[in-house]
């Protein structure tokens, strides 16, 4: 009987290392992987216009624009009258959070935004993205929350234009 029980316990031990290598992902890991997928899909969409509609559908994209008259210290974004593919700001809903990214037209019209020391970019994205120059075009999303008739920028993102 002691031989049978020792065999059984060694079988149990041999199964546990296999489970350790296939442990389920934590909610944080799942969220991080999904966020990485969002960023990858975003980069594909801004580089290839034919992928924009699929991107919009997959990530529940909304076209936003800055509210014309801002009051106080908060920046408000409202629904844009432009189509998603033509809007300057894309809102994406992910993990019950809202993020604002520069739309594909921002990258394709980079020269206009960069003129006169980024005057157009500073004006159009004030309070939404800080504007900098760097080695290449890149964007970090703004964090939004629902508020009133639109969204409030909780944390501005960063928009980098090439030098």
Spans of model-derived segments:
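Heptad-repeat coiled-coil alpha-helices
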Residues: 1-9
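Long, compositionally biased intrinsically disordered regions
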Residues: 3, 14-17
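Short intrinsically disordered, low-complexity segments
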Residues: 8-11, 22
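Extended, amphipathic alpha-helical stalk segments that mediate dimerization
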Residues: 96-163
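Charge-dense, E/K-rich amphipathic alpha-helical interfaces
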Residues: 17-115
